[in-house]
Amino acid sequence: MADNDPLASALSGLDNAESVGHLEQTIQPASNEIGSVLEVFYDRGYVDGFQFVDDGKAGRFEVELKGAINECGAVKPRYSAGADEFEKWEKRFLPARDYGTLIVTTSHGVMSHYEAREQGIGGQVIAYVY
């Protein structure tokens, strides 16, 4: 059976692995979107690192966890947010102001809502982590 939302499955797997204390998690299948989200997780300090492994099929990511994720998940449906509207989505998905990160896909790529606000651009909220 095909996976309808690979990003949601990947984030659910990360969340479950963190909650039971695993230090590594494999995400299959790999995609550019998942890679970009993992890059934001790495930049914000939620994971120690990750690498893409080409297995001749869709590939996979091997993620090194460090126990910094309390909860993460995909946002469905993908809400559009202007540069000045991120606070509304912070209140909905994050537990406190300036605690956690919204992952936003913009015309300039995937980034955290902090970077998007800094650059003055909006986009679609696709995930959250705290």
UniProtKB/Swiss-Prot annotation:
Pfam families: Ribosomal_S8
Entry annotated with the keyword DNA-binding: no
Alphabetic keyword roster: Ribonucleoprotein, Ribosomal protein, RNA-binding, rRNA-binding
Gene3D superfamilies hit by this protein: 3.30.1370.30, 3.30.1490.10
One GO term (biological process): translation
UniProt keyword Cell division, yes or no: no
PANTHER family: 40S RIBOSOMAL PROTEIN S15A (PTHR11758)
Subunit structure: Part of the 30S ribosomal subunit.
NCBIfam families: PRK04034.1 (NF003115)
Identification of the protein by name: Small ribosomal subunit protein uS8
Originating species: Natronomonas pharaonis (strain ATCC 35678 / DSM 2160 / CIP 103997 / JCM 8858 / NBRC 14720 / NCIMB 2260 / Gabara)
